[in-house]
């Protein structure tokens, strides 16, 4: 009998929880410092632009990040690993985000995008999940950096309970 408590958190919060022992397993972006944790490759994660159905960009099939930066944004809060990653790429092309609001979750970002407060960038998996219940569109980002690696992290794999080791192995083979 195994219970799984699944929480969506920012990568750096997941690393802290695994390091502190409050979480056994984490799935994070490889852009975060994992200190002494053991890591395993998981899968690629594409970033995508999300817009409200009535936004001027909504009918685009794809877009370069630099074009999107001309619009108002709904972003993740300061210190978010993903938002820092995106800000780095904006700075490399000499641009900055024009934030209308910054929030703590992909769900909250997409809810504000749905209300046409601005556009946002979220993982494609989150956009695909959320567009089932929200009136948002997902537009592919053409930039090569928009694809990032996700990794599984644990303190020490050999110290995990058997059922947790089996879960890690099952996740890795999906």
Provide a role label for each language-model segment.
Residues 137-174:
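A late-sequence structural motif
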Residues 38-48, 124, 133-147:
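Short beta-strand->loop
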Residues 27-36, 88, 92, 106-136:
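A ligand-binding cleft/hinge motif common to bilobed small-molecule-binding domains
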């Amino acid at each position: 009998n195994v219970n799984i408590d699944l929480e969506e958190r920012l990568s750096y919060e997941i690393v802290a929880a695994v390091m502190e022992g409050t979480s056994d397993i984490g799935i994070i972006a490889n852009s975060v410092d994992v200190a002494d944790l053991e890591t395993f490759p998981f899968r690629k994660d594409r970033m995508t632009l999300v817009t409200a159905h009535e936004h001027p960009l909504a009918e685009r099939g794809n877009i370069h990040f630099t074009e999107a930066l001309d619009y108002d944004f709904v972003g993740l809060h300061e210190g978010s690993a993903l938002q820092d990653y995106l800000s780095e790429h904006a700075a490399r092309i000499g641009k900055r985000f024009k934030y209308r609001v910054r929030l703590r979750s992909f769900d909250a970002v997409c809810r504000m995008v749905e209300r046409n407060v601005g556009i946002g960038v979220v993982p494609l998996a989150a956009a695909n999940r959320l567009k089932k219940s929200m009136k948002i569109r997902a537009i592919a980002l053409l930039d090569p950096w928009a694809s990032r690696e996700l990794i599984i992290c644990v303190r020490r794999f050999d110290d995990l309970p058997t059922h947790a080791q089996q879960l890690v192995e099952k996740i890795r083979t999906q």
